[in-house]
């Protein structure tokens, strides 16, 4: 029996191999092991597949690029209509482009940006504006960005697509992978399983951010997360 009755990803032979015990004995998928299995398969064949990597920001991308560029030819896709305000969006784009230009990588890395249209984000989360951070509003935002990524990966003829989002301790890696798998089936392009916070990926991203002097934002990106950050800052200030 596979994890929680779910069907295997197309890259996998035995799904149970990638499962580990979670809280209360629940089975959890180890997406890092799945990724390592895919990498090993291509290395044994002497292949360097192509990957469309959705990027949320430079700090989160730093470790992911350092890691994956050893094994893939990467096109970084910057599509984040959730980011508010526009000045913040522009700052994050510039930092990502600077990182790509400065970081040494084994295989080619290119960059493509889809224009800023905050209306796409607000339409996607309509009716869920008041849902707390980490809930359904965020899941809809995941889906919006991942769907555009899957669509473009198919158009470009890429071997795989994935996102940097799972490196964050605040992002739901299981949900990200489930959505990616579903969209991969819809658009007939392979979703690369990933949980980049594994193997101390998040810690490494902090180190690389310091090394390259990257701007590290203090909120996820959307207006709702910005308001929540400002609210918490106000509470902290009053308590001091």
Model-derived segments and spans:
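Nucleotide-activated chemistry modules centered on ATP-dependent adenylation/adenylyltransferase
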Residues: 12-14, 22-240
